[in-house]
């Protein structure tokens, strides 16, 4: 079965935020859709290993910020490729509290505040059925997952429902390219790919996840 056909399904990108006690936590998801028209209920997919899911199961109330093409891409790196168990994902961005849920500051296409109603267990993910509590208008064009792949040049984190392990391509250390030609380098943290002449600068950081130069490998064509 060719599961790459699934790549033709359309998705967005969203920041989910909630409180773990008094501490704001959050993550990036790509699967959210409205399932009722009146008294709206939404379905949100979260990985079983996701710390944010644990917090939502306890707290019930959470926010969903709709990422726009104009949003700071660093938000995707901070919230998408690290765990709230180990770090403060809101550091460098800040947050506001809307109806009891944290929302990361910045430009987004809109915000939703939701209350989790029930949790439907599947093999790798829970589908959270949640009642809409409040909305906040935003600005910008909602970012699709296709735009994320083509323009931002990012790839799905391993906790995403759309994640598929790709065949490894031969690579070599980023520091080995000094011939002045254009080369492609891939971040081993978030899989972001950058094209640049010669070597990456010593102080280079990934625009998505802020990883340092030593976390990049040259992609052999």
Positions of predicted regions on the chain:
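Basic, polyanion-binding surface patches
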Residues: 1-182, 189
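Short, intrinsically disordered terminal segments enriched in charged and Pro/Gly residues
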Residues: 176-178, 218-221
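Residues immediately within or flanking Cys/His clusters that coordinate Zn2+
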Residues: 182-184, 203
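Short cysteine-rich clusters marking metal-coordination/redox-active sites
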Residues: 187-190, 206-209
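Short Cys/His-rich zinc-binding micro-motifs
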Residues: 190-196
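Short, non-ligating residues that shape and space the ligands of small metal-coordination modules
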Residues: 196-197, 213-218
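Short linker/helix segments within small regulatory modules
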Residues: 196-205
């Amino acid at each position: 079965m060719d599961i790459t056909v699934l790549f033709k399904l359309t998705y967005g990108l969203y920041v989910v935020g909630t409180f773990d006690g008094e501490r704001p936590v959050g993550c990036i998801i790509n699967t959210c859709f409205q399932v009722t028209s009146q008294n709206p209920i939404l379905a949100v997919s979260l990985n079983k290993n996701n710390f944010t899911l644990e917090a939502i199961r306890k707290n019930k109330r959470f926010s969903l910020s709709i990422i726009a093409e104009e949003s700071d891409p660093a938000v995707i790196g901070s919230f998408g490729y690290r765990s709230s168990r180990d770090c403060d994902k809101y550091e460098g961005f800040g947050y506001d509290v809307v109806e009891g849920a944290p929302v990361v500051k910045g430009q987004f296409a809109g915000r939703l505040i939701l209350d989790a109603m029930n949790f439907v267990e599947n093999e790798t993910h829970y589908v959270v059925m949640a009642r809409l509590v409040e909305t906040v208008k935003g600005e910008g064009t909602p970012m699709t997952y296709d735009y994320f792949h083509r323009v931002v040049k990012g790839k799905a984190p391993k906790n995403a429902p759309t994640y598929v392990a790709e065949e490894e391509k031969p690579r070599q250390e980023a520091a080995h390219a000094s011939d002045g030609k254009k080369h492609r380098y891939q971040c081993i943290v978030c899989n972001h790919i950058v094209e640049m002449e010669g070597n990456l600068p010593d102080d280079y950081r990934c625009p998505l996840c802020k990883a340092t130069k030593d976390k990049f490998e040259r992609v052999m064509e």
